[in-house]
Amino acid sequence: MKGISKILSASIALMKLENVYSATALCSNAYGLTPGQQGMAQQPSYVLIPSTPGTIANCASGSQDTYSPSPAAPTSPVTPGKTSENETSPSAPAEDVGTCKIAVLKHCDAPGTTSGTTPGSGPCETPEQQQPLSVISTTPAVPVTVESAQSPSVVPVVPVVAHHQAVPGYYNNGTSGIPGQQQILSGTLPPGATLCQGQAMPSTPGQQQILSGTLPPGVTLCQGQATPSTPGQQQVLSGTLPPGVTLCQGQATPSTPGQQQVLSGTLLPGATLCQDQGMPGTSGVPGQQGQSSGQCCAPQIPNPVMPPSMNISGNGYPSSTAYSPNLGSLGSCVDIQKTGGTSCEQKPEKSATQYAMEACATPTPTVIIGNSEYLVGPGMYNAINSPCNTAVQCC
């Protein structure tokens, strides 16, 4: 027991040096006493020492009923400098209170007396006898990091065209589209991404790239620098664009810096045709508008390649109708040409809507792209992107 007392006394001294105790008097006759015990002989007070300094915030606050001191043992006179057998609690030296493992130690060996108090009613030490505690160093308690279980953030998935809902530019057998066509993305898109965004380089058939490089002002992420490009990719060519030329989508034939391609193949709804700054003296290529042969060139855009039967579309028409692969001449679209001249004046006697109606046949089936249904008929996409709706350069 003497050995245990020495260990506990050394623990108290060590914790005093580590500033575990506060500056208030730890020995009080009111601690641990119920109202019925106030007039009785004083019981020794107890100091609750947490097992670790980090838990003192959990163990040091609470009602008196939370911590029950062990029953007092009869004390005997203690000679200063000597160690007594009853310095420790007669009960078990440790109690488990809630989640705090605390050691219960007796702070006072015997009640103290003062000139104005009687034994059993005053504090263990008079205010003159209480030695102030000097703070040697402040050792803050190690903060306890509580890691709360956070549910993983739900990433929204944007549905894209399924394999059985093939649309122009996408093929069920996994092969790449015709050069100049825009691919329909397979897989899932990132949140907020549109159909013009897809996988990073390198791309695979059925995907559309987000091209690397520096983007010119006003160009979105679905356009970028990629030279040379491959079928199914989207490129913005380097160099300076002529006034009024917009950024086109897709890739037709290999181009040089400063040129912009006009797509061959089929465009998606909303895609625009672009003008190509051709090389002087060269003839225009179908699908391009060049400055070469002295005549205005209208691109020949093939019909959408319809996929296999997809049952009946929403408008009641069968969606397995086959179409001619090419529209041929666009009819009234060519009436703005002037032959034998060096300039090309556009005649606005017909509106773009009239040109579109004349160039397009009666709408027949539809094709589903995402959650939208589009009419698909001969020249339907041409009505959206027809050269009749834009200024036609003189070649």
Curated annotation (Swiss-Prot):
Give a GO biological-process term. Answer: sporulation resulting in formation of a cellular spore
Signal peptide range in chain numbering: 1-22
GO CC, sorted alphabetically, is: polar tube
Q: Region (4 X 26 AA approximate tandem repeats): which ranges?
A: 179-282
Q: Which residues are glycosylated?
A: 86, 173, 311
Q: Which UniProt keywords apply?
A: Glycoprotein, Repeat, Signal, Sporulation
Q: Where can this protein be found?
A: Spore polar tube
Ranges of the sequence repeats in the UniProt entry: 179-204, 205-230, 231-256, 257-282
Amino acid composition bias (Low complexity), ranges on this chain = 68-80, 111-128, 280-300
Classify the main location: other
Specify residue ranges for compositional bias: Polar residues.
81-91
Annotated stretches, region: Disordered = 59-95, 111-133, 277-300
What this protein is reported to do is described as: Involved with PTP2 and PTP3 in the formation of the polar tube through which the infectious agent is passed on to the host cell. Accounts for at least 70 percent of the mass of the polar tube.
Q: How does it assemble?
A: Interacts with PTP2 and PTP3.
| Protein's UniProt name | Polar tube protein 1
Organism this protein belongs to: Encephalitozoon cuniculi (strain GB-M1)
